[in-house]
């Protein structure tokens, strides 16, 4: 009996075996152990990798195969070309001649690139064959108007700047950023004696070498332009003796030439441009002529209607008009462009789309075949 446990001894408190740690250290071990056990349980229940796709497919019931659905192919869309050619800095510099005085003149590059092609605005040749164009001339006399012209007119409208415009290079860069093709107005002596401040005009009263020097001074006023705009017919454009050194300088530097000539007779400048291989365009359409019966809005609509007229066997027409910058003209062009977007008979293209390039001109282009690409 003495060896039998007394009451309560069978339920004596269990004690850790001798040699195991006790106290705070044991508590830390217990917490660490519980944490590891919980982490393992969570990994097993939550983060276990999903069954393989092959297993899921094998376990799924077989389904009957269906015929593939044949969708209609989308029509091919030609990627829209960049408005201007992407020229590297080296290519641009190669089209610039730096004079001993530090002036920068345009020139034909070593590879044969001519500025009148390199700086022309691109357009989609797959559009309607009938083409219209707009050239706003004498831009720069009024800064507020010039800003509206550049910022608000459609990019297809080409701009001809007065060479005496202050900070002209900056304004021409801004025009390019808004997708406008740019030109310089040729400074020709006005019979009424009105001229631009700081610009020496080309004159029938001086010799050819002096006129070339004055033309070069004008060329240095900006960069990235296609060529020159001859504003009105007169002694400079009508006399071959006066015009030849001027057109030759334009040809030698790879620039283009535009004439505004309402008369039916070709000028000496046109004949020389053909002979010397200059890219050339001419118009007799002055849209803001004050005595026009239908006003500017009517003249714009008439230009598009006449160009879009067609009948079998007749080639597509093209024409461009010129006008001066003013607020009414800007508003009229913006509204006209919106009307033009709702028809498909004519396309609005920059003035380069109205240039002609005859045999000698084409021979010069072939020296750099990339110039023939649209």
Give residue ranges: language-model regions.
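Alpha-helical scaffold elements lining the catalytic groove of polysaccharide deacetylases
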Residues: 198-220, 237-242, 271-312
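Active-site beta->alpha N-cap acidic-glycine motif
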Residues: 113-196
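Terminal interaction modules at protein C-ends
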Residues: 2-129
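Hydrophobic faces of well-ordered beta-strands that scaffold small-molecule active sites
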Residues: 132-136, 157-161, 182-186, 226-230, ...
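Catalytic beta/alpha-barrel core
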Residues: 135-139, 159-164, 207-214, 227-239, ...
